[in-house]
Amino acid sequence: MDQFDLEKHYAEVNAALGIKNKRSDSDESYVIDLCDEVLGELALRQHTFDFLRGDPSESCPSGKKLPVDAYYPNKNIVVEYREKQHTESVAFFDRRSTVSGVGRGEQRRIYDQRRRDILPQYGIKLIEISYSSFNYYSKKKIIRNRQRDILVVKGLL
């Protein structure tokens, strides 16, 4: 059993036992699971690079490393899943102030653009996948249909 099959097996066992992990049940995790399958490689999730950093702060003068949703080192691809808070204001996500002195929504836009600008400079292809590429509920959550969704992901990758 390879690593991909093993992780899938553990996910199935956890599901059968009723063990839930909020992050692993998210649309982001679902879409990256589909990407893993299409690309035939398990992503490094929430991976960070030394060269991709947030704004400096007192506690971190060089800026905190910015995570990417999924990195496929053998293909040199980063996949970023774009939930609704990446395209519209969401009070829950935007209420916090940031070290940069801008609202969280504005900081998210800045950091998204930073990923777009910097990753290609290091030869890394950035693929952004939006929730709107899939069928979704009014709350912008994906209506999961694995067969249909895998075709969507294949078309985007």
Regions found by a protein language model. Give the residues of each.
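Nucleic-acid endo/exonuclease domains
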Residues: 1-157
